[in-house]
Amino acid sequence: MLSIFKPAPHKARLPAAEIDPTYRRLRWQIFLGIFFGYAAYYLVRKNFALAMPYLVEQGFSRGDLGFALSGISIAYGFSKFIMGSVSDRSNPRVFLPAGLILAAAVMLFMGFVPWATSSIAVMFVLLFLCGWFQGMGWPPCGRTMVHWWSQKERGGIVSVWNCAHNVGGGIPPLLFLLGMAWFNDWHAALYMPAFCAILVALFAFAMMRDTPQSCGLPPIEEYKNDYPDDYNEKAEQELTAKQIFMQYVLPNKLLWYIAIANVFVYLLRYGILDWSPTYLKEVKHFALDKSSWAYFLYEYAGIPGTLLCGWMSDKVFRGNRGATGVFFMTLVTIATIVYWMNPAGNPTVDMICMIVIGFLIYGPVMLIGLHALELAPKKAAGTAAGFTGLFGYLGGSVAASAIVGYTVDFFGWDGGFMVMIGGSILAVILLIVVMIGEKRRHEQLLQERNGG
């Protein structure tokens, strides 16, 4: 691996008296680094959409621009997986800021170089590149969280961290307005968020650290005395990419089930998000400002929803991620049916449905990522999360744009909703299968430990 990305070497252990205060201070500091670092990736993820109306005025068709934008999702799905495998053998302190600076550089290029927005092919290639660098955001955060927080704390910490993308996702339109006020140039949609992202990358590098051992601290399991079922000394050894795949990812049946469930969770998440402005306008006769508010509320309702979901998965369901997912996905399916069946002319009900769906859907998105981290040993965590993300983006995101779009063209909005609701029912079934499988695996490990 490129030598700048090499994991930081383990240091001699600090004196016992210093371990607790150092651990506490570093955990806060590192959390700020991965929270704002990851939020900043969202500054340069969806900001191209803000420039699209101006590109339509230049004569590009909406369909073509949609195709160019899909470059981000396609590249991101692959990259999250491949970069996940690379990040399991890299220092997250260097890895996360590097990806952020590269993604921002692509956006600066698109903002300042006239031919970069001159053709669909060029835009697709540049957005594909940006999407590729975007994949360097999640895996180092996942690696950091499994090394610095123990299993019992992780649901809460992952759910707070997961709000970063809702926080980051809401900021680009504000930066764009600021840029328009200062420069009166629509390219500000591309370069304003990019400048901010670079500043945050420097902040993240200053705050983040690699493993506890690289700071002279004991592994988290020892510090918190919280060992997972299958923890042993081998869990601290770094693994090769081939070992990670062949031993822990490909043969892991439960990981395959949650990866496929992820396709259907993403189908609903992006199906509602991407199509709500069109649906609310065409079917529910919403004005532009109302449908924009609905979109904003959907994103921001995800914050309390994710926090509640993480808290419930730790405290109410006692770490049973499958059961929590079933609970939230069942409720979100009901909310989607109400949203679809509600007749035009009741805008309040539609707004409430958008808030409820946003509140409920981001929890399962977070849980599946967390669940993947826990189904694999911690040195394979990035690869496992990337594996489920690959399915989510390539299957779910692309299906949400293309399949839902074509279904609506041929069978009307009822057809589109049937696809999304059918998908979320399949997600519930798959999560029930995982729940049963986990219970069996847990009992088997207990038996081996007690009797074996």
Curated annotation (Swiss-Prot):
UniProt xrefs under CDD domains: MFS_GlpT
Keyword Transmembrane helix among record annotations: yes
Top-level taxon of origin: Bacteria
Assigned keywords, A-Z: Cell inner membrane, Cell membrane, Glycerol metabolism, Membrane, Transmembrane, Transmembrane helix, Transport
Keyword match Transmembrane helix: yes
Residue intervals on the Cytoplasmic side: 1-36, 85-93, 142-160, 208-261, 309-321, 369-387, 436-452
Cysteine disulfide partners in this protein: none
Pfam entry (one): MFS_1
Segments on the Periplasmic side according to the record's topology features: 58-63, 113-120, 181-189, 283-287, 342-346, 410-414
Subcellular localization: Cell inner membrane
Membrane topology label: Multi-pass membrane protein
Family membership: Belongs to the major facilitator superfamily. Organophosphate:Pi antiporter (OPA) (TC 2.A.1.4) family.
Name this polypeptide is given: Glycerol-3-phosphate transporter
Organism: Escherichia coli (strain K12)
